[in-house]
Regions:
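Gram-negative/organellar outer-membrane beta-barrel architecture
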Residues: 2-154, 182, 211-214, 224-231
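C-terminal transmembrane beta-barrel domains of outer membrane proteins
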Residues: 22-29, 41-43, 55-57, 151-269
Length: 269
């Protein structure tokens, strides 16, 4: 892969606090610059006031010329003046064969309530949580420059506990990603993708729920605008490929989600 860089960043003054705020996005991807397959990703996105998203990820494969690799990641999400959440990940990857990998690791979450007025009960609290995680992935490639990956399966499970100022309770989190390209012929194909996530707990906070919506999940909704304790999104596309560089596609997305805090169960499309 080539190195990639793309971004637009701006700044303005908040009318209420008079503080400097940033908006825009930044995407940086560095691949194999040290010639042993390493990858560094840096993503930042902010819309000025409502939310900020930061992600940094380092992948070091084949440590000491073995099938073992190391992955570290930091994510920070801030929703206006309501809360901020960070999660830190470290996991060891084992390359079973060219298409399959397994993972073992540790993940920690930390979230802070940013509200100045705590008299309004919106189920946001400070909390920390710690998890042991295990996962596996399978990737199949194909001879296509535009769509080099034909199918992918990725499963992650996290077992641990959440601690607030009042309680400590066990939690289980799981995520599944699957997609497949059905090649009708060289120019025509159908793309299907499913992304499912769930958290099981005795109680729930808004700032620990999954967030989805936007171009990377269900298109047509604002990014990260939907909070869910469980969701499943199905993306489908019909693709027509003109050549190795250009294609057009249709979009049909479906989703189902549950929010245990509001007892909401809803379908989206």
């Amino acid at each position: 892969k080539n190195n990639l860089f793309d971004g637009i960043l701006g700044f303005a003054t908040d009318e209420d606090s008079q503080k400097l705020i940033f908006n825009g996005y930044l995407n940086l991807e560095l691949n194999n610059n040290l010639n042993f397959g390493e990858q560094f990703l840096l993503n930042y996105k902010a819309d000025g006031k409502d939310q900020q998203n930061f992600r940094a990820r380092l992948t070091l494969p084949y440590l000491f010329n073995t099938p073992f690799g190391l992955i570290t990641e930091l994510k920070i999400f801030k929703r206006d003046s309501t809360f901020s959440t960070s999660d830190q990940l470290i996991k060891v990857r084992y390359q079973i064969n060219p298409t399959s990998k397994t993972y073992l690791g540790y993940k920690a979450y930390e979230s802070s309530n940013l509200r100045k007025d705590n008299s309004i009960n919106i189920d946001v609290e400070d909390y920390t949580s710690k998890f042991l995680l295990a996962g596996l992935s399978y990737t199949k490639t194909q001879n296509n420059i535009l769509f080099p990956i034909k199918s992918k399966f990725h499963l992650d499970t996290e077992i641990g506990s959440k601690e607030t100022k009042i309680t400590t309770e066990s939690q289980l989190r799981a995520s599944l990603l699957f997609y497949y390209i059905f090649n009708l012929n060289y120019k025509n194909s159908i793309y299907l993708k499913n992304n499912t996530k769930a958290v099981n707990s005795d109680s729930y906070l808004i700032n620990e729920l999954f967030r989805f919506g936007g171009i990377n999940s269900i298109r047509g909704f604002n990014e990260n605008s939907i909070d869910a304790s469980f969701y499943s999104v199905l993306n489908s596309e019909y693709r027509y490929q003109f050549n190795q560089d250009i294609y057009i596609h249709s979009i049909i997305d479906f989703a189902y989600f549950e929010n245990q805090i509001t007892a909401l169960k809803q379908k989206l499309y």
